[in-house]
Regions:
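Surface-exposed acidic/polar loop and edge beta-strand patches at domain peripheries
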Residues: 1-100
């Protein structure tokens, strides 16, 4: 596994990428920004490697993305209080966590 600086958030915090590669050369890239899966590179039938995931090459791309693309932890992770949420005028009850 390799770790490298990917970029910075809007408030200046470092974002790192973690690349994991297997023996055949396939690799994934993860970011510590929303637990983002940013890249999956696998071989095609001819053995040529290609990234098969729609991701971003820069932190600016990540910051401009408004739909949490690739993120396993969305924008409201650990931030819903009162065990409910309203979407498009409809109230939804959710299971209350330990602290929330």
């Amino acid at each position: 596994m390799t770790k490298s600086l990917y970029g910075k958030t809007a408030d200046g915090k470092d974002v790192f990428s973690f690349t994991i590669k297997n023996e055949s050369g396939a690799e994934i890239e993860l970011l510590n920004y929303g637990a983002t899966l940013n890249k999956i590179s696998v071989p095609d039938r001819n053995g040529d490697f290609a990234d098969v995931l729609v991701g971003f090459d820069t932190m600016e791309g990540q910051l401009s993305c408004t739909d949490s693309q690739g993120r396993t932890v969305g924008r409201v992770a650990n931030r819903i209080s009162g065990n409910g949420i309203t979407i498009a005028g409809k109230n939804y009850r959710i299971t209350k966590n330990i602290d929330g």
